[in-house]
């Protein structure tokens, strides 16, 4: 309960912190510069996701995942807050899963140059979901890292290198492989191809000492397609992720709204 309370309070703090510095763009400036295909371009938005997870132990979770992004006026700072409400077939219970918080600081962007951007990030999972009910991992996860960008016309790639720390699973009744604290790293690159009204991204990820594979290495592949149905305001999309060694799959249908 203390972890859930902390996660909720931290979420509201970040919301209040960034609402004061949220974007203040006119319709003209948004239209001329709006390009959400690049991860280093951040805009205030809410993504509503219907999610289905095929887990390693054969159970399933499904439900709603809200993803709120708040960006500063100059786009150098942004906070991403994910709040999942899922049902577990393992326990037949519905509830809050692990909240995910991400912070990005992008002090440099100049896409005509190589590299076209540089920044720092912090990715955190808060163990707000019940481990015994199959709704959470039961551990804190921290991944501070560096990001950059290379843009080649319609194609762009955004490499990220991050340190990965996963705390010990506190709710585990017995010690099992991978339940101890883990230390490793993540190497990934978000590869994006932009069409006229949509874009497709594919992200290969290598995780050293991964929480997704009992402390062993894992290879992950993510794919995301988004189509702009209302210019600069609304997108529909589909997301898929596969942990190949951790043997789990995530599917999402998304409705994204820009403010």
Label each residue range with its predicted role.
Residues 172-176:
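Acidic/Ser/Thr-rich, low-complexity mid-to-C-terminal regulatory regions of eukaryotic proteins
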Residues 1-38:
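Cleavable N-terminal export/targeting peptides
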Residues 257-259:
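Short hydrophobic/aromatic patches at helix-to-coil boundaries
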């Amino acid at each position: 309960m203390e972890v859930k309370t902390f996660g909720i309070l931290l979420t509201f703090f970040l919301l209040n912190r960034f609402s004061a510095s949220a974007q203040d763009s006119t319709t003209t400036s948004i239209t001329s510069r709006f390009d959400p295909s690049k991860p280093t371009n951040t805009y205030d938005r809410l993504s509503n996701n219907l999610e289905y997870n095929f887990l390693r132990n054969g159970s399933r979770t499904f439900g709603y995942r809200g993803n709120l992004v708040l960006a500063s006026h100059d786009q150098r700072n942004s906070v991403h807050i994910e709040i999942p409400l899922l049902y577990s077939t393992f326990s037949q219970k519905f509830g809050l899963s692990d909240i995910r918080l991400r912070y990005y600081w992008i002090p440099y962007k100049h896409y005509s140059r190589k590299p076209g951007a540089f920044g720092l990030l912090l990715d955190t999972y808060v163990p707000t979901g019940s481990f015994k009910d199959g709704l959470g991992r039961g551990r804190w996860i921290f991944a501070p890292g560096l990001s950059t960008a290379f843009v080649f016309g319609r194609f762009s790639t955004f490499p990220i290198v991050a340190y990965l720390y996963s705390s010990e699973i506190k709710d585990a009744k017995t010690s099992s492989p991978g339940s101890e604290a883990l230390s490793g790293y993540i190497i990934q690159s978000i590869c994006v191809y932009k069409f006229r009204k949509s874009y497709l991204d594919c992200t290969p990820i290598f995780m050293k000492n991964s929480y997704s594979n009992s402390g062993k290495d894992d290879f992950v592949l993510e794919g995301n397609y988004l189509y702009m149905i209302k210019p600069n305001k609304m997108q529909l999309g589909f997301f898929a992720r596969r942990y190949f060694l951790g043997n789990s799959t995530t599917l999402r249908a998304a409705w994204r709204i820009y403010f």
